[in-house]
C-alpha cells in the first residue's frame, strides 16, 4: 500500500511517484487548492490537491477531516521558495496528489486534538483513557521511538561488543519479598498455593552465574505492589545484567562504556569517562542525599562540633540526643529569601516539615561579616564561634545560612529538599548539563524502627566489604548506584557467593535458618556446587528514558502506563472477575465495603 514513510521522503525523491499512508494531521483550503498534512510515526509531509489536476481526488480531499486515515499516491515536487519550511524535515518538498483513497474516517468526535499544531494541554486522565490517540501525538511518538533506540543501543553494545547473552527468566515464580509487596497469582493446579510476579530477576540471574552463563542481560519486566509516585509504576522495565569473574572496578568501567554508548547513539553526546565517584558517606555529608544532583553547588556543612557547647538549646539539645546540626549556605540568599518564607506558614518551612523537620533556624551575613538574625542563635554564639562558622561555610556578605538540627536522617532529608528547591528557584541548576556519578560503599544494613530489626539497604544478596566481614552490623556493602542529574538510574553490587556468608546475612536481618531455607533454599543449595564470584547491576529503563527525553514522569515514556492509583484507564483494569473463575482458582473474594 505504501512505498515510503512520510518522514522519509526528501529532495532526492523529486519527480518520483510515491504511495503514502497515514493520518491527516491538518487540512487547509487556500484559494481552491487544498493542503493536507499527512502524518505517520516518522513525521509529517505536505500533500497538495489541485482541482485542475485531479478533480476526483480534490472532491475527496474536501470531505477529509483531521485524523482520517488515507492513502495518497502522488508526485514529489520541490516547494516554491516562499513555501519552504526549514523547521520541518520534509519542508523542502510536497506531494501533488494524483489519487486519494479514504481508508477510514471518524465515528465519534475526537476527545482532544491530536494535531501537531495544537498546543493546548490535555488532562492526563483523558490522555490515558484514549491512549491510542495520545500516542499519535508528536511528543509521545518521539518518546516511544527514543525508548526503542535506547533498547536497540543496549542490545548492540552488550551483544556485539561485550559478548553478553540475553536470557529470559520466569515471570511466574515463588514469593520471596525483597522490600515491597508481591503481586500474587493463585495456582489452579495446586489449590492453596501461589505464584508471585518477580520484583526483579535477582535470584535467577545469580543462578545463571552458577550455570556458567558468565555475561547475562535481559530487558526484564518487574512488578512491585507499592505506593506510587511520579517515577514509580506497579509494573516497570529494567535492564538487568550479571557478570562472573569481574571485580567491582571492572563492572563500573564496563557500565560507563555502556552508558556512554547509549548517549552517543541516541543523543549524539560524547560523555567524558570515567564518571566521578562519591562514597555514600561523602554524598550524605556534602549533599544530604545518596543520589545527589551535583549540577550545582550549595553543599552542606556539618557544624555539630561547633554548636554542641553553644547556649542555643535547639542545637545543643539535638546533639545531646545523638543528633547533628548542619547548615546550608546560600549565596545571595539575603535578597532572594525573606524571613516569612522560612517561618511557619512559609513555603520553605512547609517543604522542610514534609520530610519531618520541626523548624528551621537561620542567620544572615551582612557587610563586614556581621551575623544578623532574629532569634537566639546570634546571642548564644561567641565571637570565636561566629568567625569559625563564617570560615567553614565560606560565607560572604549576602549569604543566608539555613540550619537544621535533629537526628541525622531528618537533618539530611530536610536540607537535601531545601537545597533542591532553592537551587531550582534561584536558577542555579543548568538544565542542559548532564551529570553522571557513581555512589559507592553503602552501608550493608539500615535499622527498621517499626520492626525493630536490621534490614538490607539494597538487598540481602549484596556482598559485604571484605574488611568488614567480621562485623556485619556496621559493614559496608560492595554496592554502587549510578546517579543521573539527581535520579538513581541504576544500582548493583558484588554478590555473596558462599553459603556460610549468605546464611550470616540472613541471620543478621532476622531470618531464621528454617525461614531462609524455605524462601531461598534453592539458592543456598546452588552455592554448594562451585559458584563463581559475580556481580551485577539493574537500570530503571523507564526512568533512564524519561531523563533522556527530558520528561517529568515515566508515564510519558511508557506506552500503556498505570495511573498513580495503579489503574489502567484504557482497559479499565483492574476489574472484577467472574465467580466461576475464582472458584476454579480455589479463591474467594471479600467484597469491598460499599460507602
Swiss-Prot record:
Q: What is any Pfam family matched here?
A: tRNA_anti-codon
Please tell me where L-aspartate binds in this chain: 178, 224, 458, 495
**Compartments in which it is found:** Cytoplasm
- Gene source species: Trichodesmium erythraeum (strain IMS101)
Catalysed reaction(s) here are: tRNA(Asx) + L-aspartate + ATP = L-aspartyl-tRNA(Asx) + AMP + diphosphate
State the InterPro entries in the record: Aa-tRNA-synt_II, aa-tRNA-synth_II, aa-tRNA-synth_II/BPL/LPL, Asp-tRNA-ligase_1, Asp-tRNA-ligase_1_N, Asp/Asn-tRNA-synth_IIb, AspRS_core, GAD-like_sf
Q: Name one GO cellular component term.
A: cytoplasm
Functional summary from the UniProt entry: Aspartyl-tRNA synthetase with relaxed tRNA specificity since it is able to aspartylate not only its cognate tRNA(Asp) but also tRNA(Asn). Reaction proceeds in two steps: L-aspartate is first activated by ATP to form Asp-AMP and then transferred to the acceptor end of tRNA(Asp/Asn).
Site positions for Important for tRNA non-discrimination, renumbered to this chain? 30
Note the subunit structure: Homodimer.
Superkingdom, natural source: Bacteria
> What's its EC?
6.1.1.23
**Protein family membership:** Belongs to the class-II aminoacyl-tRNA synthetase family. Type 1 subfamily.
Q: Which residues bind ATP?
A: 224-226, 233, 488, 540-543
Location (main, coarse)? cytoplasm
Which GO BP terms, alphabetically?
aspartyl-tRNA aminoacylation
Instruction: Provide the protein name.
Output: Aspartate--tRNA(Asp/Asn) ligase
**Keywords, comma-separated and alphabetical:** Aminoacyl-tRNA synthetase, ATP-binding, Cytoplasm, Ligase, Nucleotide-binding, Protein biosynthesis
Q: Does the keyword Aminoacyl-tRNA synthetase apply?
A: yes
GO MF annotation terms? aspartate-tRNA ligase activity; aspartate-tRNA(Asn) ligase activity; ATP binding; nucleic acid binding
**Where are the annotated segments for Aspartate?**
202-205
- UniProt keyword Cytoplasm present: yes
Amino acid at each position: 500500500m505504501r512505498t515510503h514513510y512520510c518522514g522519509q521522503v526528501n529532495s532526492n525523491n523529486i519527480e518520483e511517484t510515491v504511495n503514502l499512508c497515514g493520518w491527516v494531521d491538518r487540512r487547509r483550503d487556500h484559494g481552491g487548492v487544498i493542503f493536507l498534512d499527512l502524518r505517520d510515526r516518522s513525521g509529517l509531509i505536505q500533500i497538495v490537491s489541485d482541482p485542475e489536476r485531479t478533480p476526483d481526488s480534490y472532491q475527496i480531499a474536501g470531505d477529509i477531516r483531521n485524523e482520517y486515515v488515507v492513502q495518497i499516491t502522488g508526485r514529489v515536487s520541490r516547494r516554491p521558495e516562499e513555501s519552504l519550511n526549514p523547521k520541518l524535515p520534509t519542508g523542502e518538498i510536497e506531494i501533488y496528489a494524483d489519487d486519494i483513497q479514504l481508508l477510514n474516517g471518524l465515528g465519534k468526535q475526537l476527545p482532544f486534538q491530536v494535531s501537531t499544531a495544537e498546543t493546548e494541554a490535555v488532562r492526563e486522565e483523558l490522555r490515558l483513557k484514549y491512549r491510542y490517540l495520545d500516542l499519535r501525538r508528536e511528543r509521545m511518538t518521539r518518546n516511544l521511538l527514543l525508548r526503542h533506540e535506547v533498547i536497540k543501543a543496549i542490545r548492540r553494545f552488550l551483544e556485539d561488543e561485550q559478548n553478553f547473552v540475553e536470557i529470559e527468566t520466569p515471570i511466574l515464580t515463588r514469593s520471596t519479598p525483597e522490600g515491597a509487596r508481591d503481586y500474587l497469582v493463585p495456582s489452579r493446579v495446586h489449590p492453596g498455593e501461589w505464584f508471585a510476579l518477580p520484583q526483579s530477576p535477582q535470584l535467577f540471574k545469580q543462578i545463571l552465574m552458577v550455570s556458567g552463563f558468565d555475561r547475562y542481560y535481559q530487558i526484564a519486566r518487574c512488578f512491585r505492589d507499592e505506593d506510587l509516585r511520579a517515577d514509580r509504576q506497579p509494573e516497570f522495565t529494567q535492564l538487568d545484567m550479571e557478570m562472573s569473574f569481574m571485580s567491582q572496578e571492572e563492572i563500573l568501567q564496563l557500565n560507563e562504556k555502556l552508558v556512554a554508548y547509549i548517549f552517543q547513539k541516541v543523543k549524539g553526546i560524547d560523555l567524558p569517562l570515567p564518571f566521578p565517584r562519591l562514597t555514600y558517606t561523602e554524598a550524605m555529608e556534602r549533599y544530604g542525599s545518596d543520589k545527589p544532583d551535583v549540577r550545582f553547588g550549595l553543599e552542606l556543612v556539618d557544624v555539630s562540633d561547633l554548636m554542641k557547647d553553644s547556649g542555643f538549646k535547639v542545637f545543643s539539645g539535638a546533639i545531646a540526643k545523638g543528633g547533628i546540626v548542619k547548615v546550608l549556605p546560600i549565596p545571595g540568599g539575603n535578597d532572594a529569601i525573606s524571613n516569612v518564607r522560612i517561618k511557619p506558614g512559609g513555603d520553605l518551612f512547609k517543604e522542610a516539615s514534609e520530610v519531618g523537620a520541626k523548624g528551621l533556624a537561620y542567620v544572615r551575613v551582612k557587610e563586614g561579616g556581621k551575623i544578623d538574625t532574629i532569634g537566639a542563635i546570634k546571642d548564644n554564639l561567641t565571637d570565636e564561634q561566629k568567625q569559625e562558622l563564617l570560615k567553614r561555610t565560606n560565607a560572604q556578605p549576602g549569604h543566608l545560612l539555613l540550619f537544621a538540627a535533629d537526628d541525622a536522617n531528618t537533618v539530611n532529608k530536610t536540607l537535601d529538599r531545601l537545597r533542591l528547591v532553592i537551587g531550582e528557584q534561584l536558577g542555579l541548576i543548568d538544565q542542559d548539563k548532564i551529570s553522571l556519578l557513581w555512589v559507592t560503599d553503602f552501608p550493608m544494613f539500615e535499622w527498621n524502627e517499626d520492626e525493630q530489626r536490621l534490614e538490607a539497604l539494597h538487598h540481602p544478596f549484596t556482598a559485604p566489604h571484605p574488611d568488614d566481614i567480621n562485623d556485619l552490623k556496621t559493614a559496608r556493602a560492595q554496592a554502587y548506584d549510578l546517579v543521573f542529574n539527581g535520579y538513581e538510574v541504576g544500582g548493583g553490587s558484588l554478590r555473596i557467593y558462599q553459603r556460610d556468608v549468605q546464611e550470616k546475612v540472613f541471620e543478621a536481618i532476622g531470618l531464621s535458618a528454617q525461614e531462609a531455607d524455605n524462601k531461598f533454599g534453592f539458592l543456598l543449595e546452588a552455592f554448594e556446587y562451585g559458584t563463581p564470584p559475580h556481580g551485577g547491576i539493574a537500570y530503571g529503563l523507564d526512568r533512564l528514558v524519561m531523563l533522556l527525553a527530558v520528561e517529568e514522569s515515566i508515564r510519558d515514556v511508557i506506552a500503556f502506563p498505570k495511573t498513580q492509583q495503579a489503574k489502567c484507564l484504557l482497559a479499565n483494569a483492574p476489574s472484577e472477575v467472574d465467580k466461576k473463575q475464582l472458584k476454579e482458582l480455589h479463591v474467594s473474594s471479600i467484597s469491598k465495603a460499599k460507602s
